[in-house]
Regions:
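Hydrophobic, well-ordered secondary-structure segments
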Residues: 2-3, 234
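Short acidic, glycine/serine/threonine-rich loops at helix termini
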Residues: 103-106, 153-159, 183-188, 239-243, ...
Length: 407
């Protein structure tokens, strides 16, 4: 892309200030800035200008409960294992985050969760996936989403660890796409004179990022019909779970979600409901007090099934989402940016920029239906989000020990 072409493109979106320092840059810096402009999706700015749509009519949605699953476990497991053996199932690990909140400078997955050994979050997840591959007798294709920040370090770490025994040929990497950061007036921030301030485009961008990386060709070549997407920060996460896959297929659903019963009405977790007759995840802050506290005749919460970011999607339905624009969520954050006089890059003490993100929960609402698959919290939900307190390293370690994992 040449300067004039970049200027014309930026003018279309009212962002020509990004070229303010162009004439002061070296040839290499100019080329890098033009490259960044050429690759950037500026259409998100138009979507960001619109208010998020209000929720429709919300109703409770029942689940395939733990007791119901136990009754049909053998049937579900056989269906799921058959699908895995056919090569119809892939797993997608969302691992773009950093471990900064855990006191770790690298990727969150390399954080050491072990106490007396070197067990990392990545190793926990690879072990859990290998449990499935041993049952099935075949590997499950694993797609790992990294970020610009941690891609090289993630690849190097897993290569050094020899993928914890997982076949390297079954592991595919792709980098999460980035979105520009804007100020209160909708102007894109500069990080330096030659670099636009960007941030990851949210966990809802995982499938479009797979497409961008050319991995939809792999799905087609290998006849992968289902993708199980899950987050890096749950060390008890059971992925490519044959029983979960089998139950979703048996129910003729186009998607499935693992859920846990909420510990209390005030637990800050998204709840899977129906919105205007379609599956939808309602965030904690979107629920009224009445909804949070509503109970059934048996005393259980009416809106009780919380999501744990473990979803199963049919690939043909995911492909349809590529033609639609997921809702854009704006998060007001502290973002390192160039000072007004252009002399230095600083990270402000107060939030100064909107990060533009899509969320995987909005992909659920685009599905015709979704099977809620209840799992035991103590066996499958040990999030590692904080250094101490709730959902922390300590609570995750306690749950790992409870499940017989040596630390």
């Amino acid at each position: 892309m040449q300067y004039q072409e970049a200027y014309n493109r930026l003018e279309q979106y009212g962002q020509t200030h990004l070229l303010r320092y162009y004439d002061t840059l070296s040839a290499a810096e100019q080329a890098a800035l033009l490259q960044q402009i050429s690759e950037m999706d500026f259409s998100v700015l138009e979507r960001a200008a619109h208010e998020e749509a209000p929720k429709g009519k919300i109703e409770p949605l029942g689940a395939c409960t733990i007791s119901e699953i136990a009754e049909k476990q053998d049937t579900y497991r056989k269906i799921g294992l058959d699908a895995i053996r056919k090569g119809s199932v892939g797993a997608v690990l969302l691992a773009g985050g950093q471990g900064s909140r855990l006191g770790c400078n690298g990727p969150k997955g390399v954080f050491r969760i072990g106490i007396n050994n070197d067990l990392t979050i990545f190793e926990c997840l690879f072990r859990n996936l290998m449990d499935v591959t041993e049952q099935a007798g075949v590997p499950v294709p694993l797609f790992i989403m990294t970020s610009e920040t941690n891609d090289a370090e993630t690849r190097a770490f897993l290569a050094e660890k020899l993928y914890f025994g997982y076949p390297e040929s079954s592991v595919h990497f792709f980098v999460q796409e980035m979105a520009p950061v804007v100020d209160k007036d909708g102007k894109i921030l500069l990080e330096t004179k030659s670099r636009i301030a960007v941030s990851p485009n949210g966990n809802g961008g995982w499938f479009s990022s797979m497409q961008h990386a050319g991995l939809l060709n792999v799905l087609k070549e290998q006849n992968i019909e289902w993708l199980n997407v899950f987050a890096v920060d749950n060390v008890l996460q059971r992925m490519a779970d044959p029983c979960f896959i089998g139950a979703t297929i048996a129910a003729n659903c186009t998607s499935g979600s693992k859920v846990v019963a909420k510990a209390s009405p005030d637990e800050k977790v998204g709840v899977l409901c129906l919105e205007d007759g379609k599956p939808s995840i309602v965030e904690y802050f979107e629920m009224t007090d009445d909804m949070r506290n509503l109970r059934e005749a048996d005393g259980t919460l009416t809106y009780r099934y919380g999501v744990i970011l473990n979803y199963l999607f049919r690939v043909d339905q995911l492909c349809k989402t590529l033609d639609c624009s997921l809702p854009l969520h704006r998060a007001f954050k502290k973002v390192a940016c160039l000072t007004a006089d252009g002399t230095a890059t600083v990270k402000p003490e107060q939030p100064n920029g909107y990060k533009l993100e899509t969320l995987v929960l909005d992909m659920v609402h685009m599905q015709e239906n979704c099977l809620l698959y209840e799992v035991e919290r103590e066996k499958e939900f040990a999030p590692v989000k904080n250094a101490t307190g709730v959902d922390s390293v300590d609570t995750a370690r306690a749950l790992l020990k409870q499940n017989g994992v040596a630390l």
